[in-house]
Amino acid sequence: MDGRTKVYFTSDAHLGSGYHADPRTGECRLVRWLQSIEGDARAVYFLGDMFDYWFEYRTGVPRGHVRFLGQVALMADQGIEIHFFAGNHDVWFADYLEKELGAQVHHEEALVTLDGKTFRLAHGDKEYCGLSWTNRFLYRLFRHPVARCLYAAVHPRWTVGFALSCSLRSRKRGVRKATVGQVPHAYHNEYFEIEKEWLVRWTKAHIEEHPEVDYYLFGHRHLLVDLALRGEKRIVILGDWLQYNSFAVWDGSALWIDQFLEEEDQV
């Protein structure tokens, strides 16, 4: 593990989504990024929605994603810590990633201490569900054991296509939606003052009761945010792999956002 000093955070690749112009190209780009960091990574945290859809049956998982899963397995075999957080698109993790990849799976937010600093890590859908009753209802529904059992009883030939089409429609609606109630809502950074973003407002309230947290990291919102809060405390929203190809890096003393840019991106 000599030379492995950095911790990486990323989210929202939405592998398998029809919103990717070419899903295979998007997956291969993500794999190339993982290959580029495996020499210095001590841990990688995937903060949710790495898959556009994921449901584990007792004896099966969704087809596809083999290049990504294979690369993650190779990194885990080298001793790199791998953490998957459930998002709202891939909420139904069971034990496949733990048994086959050696990953740690988190179904809730987690407090992690790295080099003496406290990180609060979460996908962000739980915090964001306070925005409306529909968000709260769907959050609880998707995590209810009865709902999961009933869903598992339906043949995948129906559920997979249904779930992916719902995801695509939701994404298209979200791109067009300017607000949710009185709160700004969109999938890009150019639409409003970032101080009004719901997760920023939520974090400012949370930090008043939890001053021990140094860094808040979220996915979910498809925004690139690195905002100072109080003192050296910060909130980071990780962007995505649909438009930003973004991630965050902790090197033991500093945290920053970066993007995986290849030659064609820099022309």
At which residue positions do the language-model features occur?
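N-terminal short leaders/motifs
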Residues: 52-75, 170, 184-213
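Active-site-proximal loop/helix segment associated with metal-binding centers of metalloenzymes
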Residues: 124-201
